[in-house]
Amino acid sequence: MSSRTSSAGERAPASEPSSAREPKAGTGSGPEADHRASGASAINTAIKHRPALSPSRASDFKHCPLLYRFRAIDRLPETPTPVQVRGIVVHAVLEELFGLPAEERLPDRAHDLVAPAWRRVREERPELAELFGAEDDGQAMASWLASTGELLDGYFRLEDPRLVQPEARELLVETELGSGVLLRGYIDRLDAAPTGELRVVDYKSGTAPREFNEAKALFQMKFYAVVLWRLRGVVPRQLRLMYLADRQSLTYTPDEAELARFERTLDAIWQAILKAGKTGDFRPNPGRLCDWCSHKERCPAFGGTPPEYPGWPEPDAGEESAVDRAD
């Protein structure tokens, strides 16, 4: 069952965590979420990692198998947009905010964290210094920073961070299912009650979806719920998406039977990926979002030519390939 709330300064429920454990595990550089711009930096193709399924890559394959290939196998670079980078900065600020003593988690302090967060992002990704172009007189940058502050204001309308003590922030979670598929993702925030109940929180810098699109929005959260269920043996009590632009929350309470079904869905997606990976037959799926795709010029649906298929990535060439084991 899902439910929505709007900006009402929601207080933490009685089962909110009271202890402070902050195992900030692995921030990494993988293209895992909307705020980690997918494939935005070139990857050393000489280094092969064991393929894993993340929420973003699973969604890519469902939407367009060729896009999955470009991002997960070819690891082609993409240039993030100002909107995407704004999301990165907002997430960085909220992560930093929860590192402060509870009494200091105030709107003014969050705004003070924006400029340092933006500076760190530029240091990690120097190419983003040209985000607004050489012709910018500073007004575009100022407007962009102001819009970042507005998203933070939206967050404070949804929640009082002084009442929440997360167990973890930017938490890397990973588990292997019985079928062999490796699931991996980053959770923005994990809250744990003294009773052991878990709440998964994800920040979105956009607006809440319409009700008929809720299932698509919750795909990512159910993914995290499956991983936590398999890692800890506990079904999260609540999955919460916080949409900062229009100050709405979408909450969902999963159950074990539903997560078991969703696990089978992930298995099916992975088997389809392996089947395509065997031959490199990742087909395009043209649609209304193609105009915003960074790879449109190399897509055969629009007269382009994809790069030569590099083959399925395996960490050890001496091992039997997962693709070889696929039906």
Segments from the language model and where they lie:
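A non-catalytic, helix-rich entry segment at domain boundaries
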Residues: V93-R169
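Short cysteine/histidine-rich zinc-coordinating motifs and their immediately flanking basic loops
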Residues: F302-W312
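Mg2+/Mn2+-dependent nuclease catalytic core
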Residues: L171-A268
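Polybasic (Lys/Arg-rich)
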Residues: E258-S294
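Short, polar/flexible loop-turn hinges at active-site or ligand-entry regions and domain interfaces
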Residues: D74-V83, L100-R105, R210-E211, G280-D281
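C-terminal, charged and often intrinsically disordered regions of DNA end-processing helicases
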Residues: M1-Q84, P315-D327
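Short cysteine clusters
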Residues: C64, C290-C293, C299
